[in-house]
Amino acid sequence: MKVKILQWHAVASWTWDAQDETCGICRMAFDGCCPDCKLPGDDCPLIWGACNHAFHLHCILKWVNSQTSQAHCPMCRREWQFKE
């Protein structure tokens, strides 16, 4: 007895592996994208700091480069360092 597959419709979903569900800077969901991007995914990745807080890449880069942030994490105020 042989089985012949006529059609196959695969469905997949993904989520970021972050403790929070929203970016602490722009307040947009991590499964979406930051205000600067049109589509979520590789062009708008999540970035973790040494303090384990996660943000959209574009959001944290703007935050760290702003004059008022003094390059500190917006959540815990530790000096911002990208997690290796």
Curated annotation (Swiss-Prot):
Location relative to the cell: Cytoplasm; Nucleus
Gene3D superfamilies tied to this protein: Zinc/RING finger domain, C3HC4 (zinc finger) (3.30.40.10)
Pathway(s) annotated for this protein in UniProt: Protein modification; protein ubiquitination
UniProt keyword Chaperone present: no
Subunit comment: Part of the APC/C complex composed of at least 10 subunits. Interacts with APC2.
Task of the protein: Component of the anaphase promoting complex/cyclosome (APC/C), a cell cycle-regulated E3 ubiquitin-protein ligase complex that controls progression through mitosis and the G1 phase of the cell cycle. The APC/C complex controls several key steps in the cell cycle by mediating ubiquitination and subsequent degradation of target proteins such as cyclins. The APC/C complex is required for the female gametophyte development and is involved in several aspect of development by controlling cell division and cell elongation. Involved in the control of endoreduplication.
Annotated GO biological process: anaphase-promoting complex-dependent catabolic process; cell division; positive regulation of mitotic metaphase/anaphase transition; protein ubiquitination; ubiquitin-dependent protein catabolic process
GO cellular component, one term: nucleus
Pfam families xrefs: zf-ANAPC11 (PF12861)
PANTHER family named in the record: RING BOX
Record's protein name: Anaphase-promoting complex subunit 11
Alphabetically ordered keywords of this record: Cell cycle, Cell division, Cytoplasm, Metal-binding, Mitosis, Nucleus, Ubl conjugation pathway, Zinc, Zinc-finger
Family in the record: Belongs to the RING-box family.
Molecular function, one GO term: cullin family protein binding
RING-type Zn finger ranges: 34-77
